[in-house]
């Protein structure tokens, strides 16, 4: 049975957050929103997740070329090493999918800079796997 009304709202105890590839080179061609605003928003999202105890998975892609996570974001989780991927689709990296599943949380919140690739592909695949999810396009 589908939940409606207040029961349909996200609850921290049910959620896991996946922050995809918030690296300096990813911001280089970002023109849909002002980059500083996007940085502040994703850091705010990460801090909120941390305060509410929402497990957070960090990813990078081709870290050796694209750089580490943006500093403010890594500062929220100083002891956490991002999963450095080579796949375009985050969900195709079993380390990411397994990390999400390991949390036992049923609602996946995914935040990424590029909707067409970084966000859409893993969401479609996670949906196909039967995982409930919430999209968060950084803006």
Sequence positions of predicted segments:
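A generic structural motif
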Residues: 84, 138-139
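Short hydrophobic alpha-helical runs that function as membrane-insertion/retention elements
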Residues: 134-136
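Internal catalytic-core helix/loop-beta-alpha segment
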Residues: 85-131
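Active-site acidic carboxylates
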Residues: 1-87, 132
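Cofactor-binding loop segments of dinucleotide-utilizing enzymes, especially the Rossmann-like FAD-
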Residues: 61, 113, 138
């Amino acid at each position: 049975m589908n939940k409606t009304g207040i029961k349909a709202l996200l609850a921290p105890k049910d959620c896991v957050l996946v922050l995809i590839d918030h690296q300096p080179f990813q911001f280089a061609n970002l023109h849909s929103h002002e980059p500083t605003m996007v940085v502040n928003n994703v850091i705010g999202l990460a801090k909120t997740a941390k305060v509410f105890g929402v497990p957070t998975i960090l990813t990078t892609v081709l870290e050796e070329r694209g750089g580490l996570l943006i500093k403010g974001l890594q500062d929220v989780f100083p002891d956490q090493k991002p999963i450095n991927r080579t796949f375009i689709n985050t969900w195709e990296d079993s380390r990411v999918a397994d990390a999400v599943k390991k949390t036992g949380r049923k609602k996946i919140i995914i935040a990424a800079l590029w909707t067409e690739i970084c966000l859409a592909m893993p969401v479609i695949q996670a949906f196909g796997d039967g995982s409930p999810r919430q999209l968060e396009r950084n803006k």
